[in-house]
A protein has these predicted regions:
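Long lumenal/extracellular ectodomains of secretory and single-pass membrane proteins
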Residues: 1-305, 315-483
Length: 483
């Protein structure tokens, strides 16, 4: 190897905040983006655009699909801020890639994402796309047909915020309507699609159809519903708890619910009902164990995400690891879920050892310790281990091997094959990867959404790139094109 190549090889390595050897790239720029894009909520714009730029340089169509996967509220990660940062960057640097997909922004995300393009080279294209959808909705409204959700998110001049009012005036002008007429049309559209905020502001609480209230609106306004419509809303929630009526939760993240109980100490029937209503993406017979990072660096929302995803998976997994998972900080612990309600389960889990350092090595050693103590045969070991963490794991005592190499060696010496490992990043602060792009039996994931479980469990045994390509190249994203 030449010295230049040796320098490049050495340049791939980094250390976590706690001293463990890791890689600063997976070796595939697309995978670097995919493996972190759901965990960049606290990242600065430069880091987000740098990751996207690297992936775009490698494959512009694939990188664009990753961006829309990240925004995809129902089938992807539901990341709003990161997506908006990326589409603004695309409009400035690569308008040819975003232009043919403007009509899809409101399909995968929200129509108000389009406002991010004001002041960019694609502003005129954005207004044209919005006007086209608005005119189509107006025709359907007049014909008594279903319309899109554009009217829910479009800005009007009667908003309470001065900035939003200004944007509403601009919107009416750009779409070619007098301001008053525009407000009137939007009001009619919102009535057609049943925008709950319109009914609330008009004091028409008795007209709200609670089974039709969107997931996030139900969570945000739950106290207002109880205050202004206690009898009807209370009756609805009681029925929802029993499964007699539907309560929407499909676009919520587990942390949305968990953090209100974990940090807000809130006991609420709405939260319990929405938790039960979260979509189930865990297939029967799934042989996988979750390791949830509860170390000090995970405080706040990352902790609620880690615990929420672990509880979600454990209670819905009807296989061998039903109601079982592990936590790790300075000391790993086996958790057996107890309690009937989510509040009870969170209370019991919170008694575990939290807020220490991030000793993932000890957690894997604990798996081996339990297996050897009870003479567990290979076929009864977990097929997969899902590590939910910020990936800033502790120093493992070897200057050359990555964490995965060390653990694979330990399992081999103990007479076991290391399980498939999914490194699921929920709060990426640095470019840290614990496996490269061609490591078979390892997958990289990121984000806060339960849909990730479905994707990773369908890709066990693949290498990280294959698993990523199976997700991004699905039919759902075939509609995305670049010029």
């Amino acid at each position: 190897m030449s010295f230049a190549d040796a320098m490049r090889e050495e340049g791939r390595f980094t250390r976590t905040e706690n001293g463990a050897v890791a890689l600063n790239t997976s070796g595939d720029a697309r995978l670097d983006l995919f493996g972190t894009i759901g965990s960049l909520r606290e990242a600065d714009e430069n880091r987000i655009t740098t990751l996207f730029a690297g992936a775009y340089a490698q494959d512009k169509l694939f990188a664009t699909k990753i961006a829309f996967y990240a925004r995809d509220i129902r089938g992807g990660l539901g990341e709003r801020k990161t997506f908006r940062t990326i589409i603004r960057y695309m409009a400035e640097k690569h308008p040819e890639a975003l232009r043919p997909n403007l009509d899809l922004v409101g399909v995968f995300g929200r129509y108000d994402d389009l406002y991010e393009l004001i002041g960019t080279p694609l502003e005129d294209d954005m207004w044209a796309a919005m006007k086209k959808q608005f005119e189509e909705d107006l025709q359907n409204l007049n014909a008594g047909n279903a319309i899109s959700l554009l009217a829910k998110w479009i800005k009007t001049a009667d908003a309470s915020s001065p900035a939003t009012r200004k944007l509403g005036i601009l919107t009416a002008q750009k779409l070619g309507y007098p301001i008053y007429n525009f407000k009137r049309i939007v009001r009619s559209m919102r009535k057609q699609i049943g925008v709950v905020e319109s009914l609330m502001s008009a004091g028409r609480w008795d007209e709200i159809k609670y089974p039709e209230v969107p997931s996030r609106a139900m969570m945000i306004y739950r106290k207002a519903f109880m205050k202004h419509d206690a009898e009807r809303f209370g009756e609805f929630i009681n029925k929802a708890e029993k499964g007699e009526v539907k309560i929407n939760a499909s676009t919520l993240f587990p942390y949305d619910i968990v953090e209100k109980i974990l940090y807000g100490r809130e006991s609420n029937k709405v939260l319990e009902a929405q938790w039960k209503a979260l979509p189930d993406y865990v297939e029967k017979g799934t042989n996988a164990l979750v390791m949830a990072d509860v170390s000090g660096s995970m405080r706040g929302r990352p902790m609620a995400t880690s615990i929420g995803l672990a509880i979600y998976f454990a209670e819905r997994n009807v296989g061998a690891y039903h109601n079982l998972f592990m936590t790790f900080s300075d000391r790993p612990e086996t958790v057996i879920l107890r309690g009937e309600t989510l509040e009870q389960k969170i209370c019991n889990v919170s008694r575990a050892n939290w807020d220490g350092n991030t000793d993932l090595k000890a957690a894997f050693e604990r798996v081996l310790e339990i297996a050897k103590k009870h003479n567990t045969p290979q076929e009864e070991m977990p097929k997969a281990i899902v590590v939910i963490s910020d990936m800033e794991i502790d120093y493992c005592g070897n200057l050359e091997w990555s964490f995965y190499d060390k653990m694979a060696n330990k399992f081999c010496k103990a007479g076991y094959v290391i399980p498939n490992i999914i490194f699921w990043n929920v709060n990426s602060r640095h470019d840290v990867f614990h496996a490269d792009h061609n490591r078979k039996g390892v997958q990289l994931a990121s984000g806060q959404s339960v849909t990730v479980f479905k994707q990773i469990l369908q890709n066990l045994g693949y290498n990280p790139v294959e698993a990523m390509e199976n997700t991004i190249n699905s039919e759902r994203y075939d509609c995305i094109t670049v010029e």
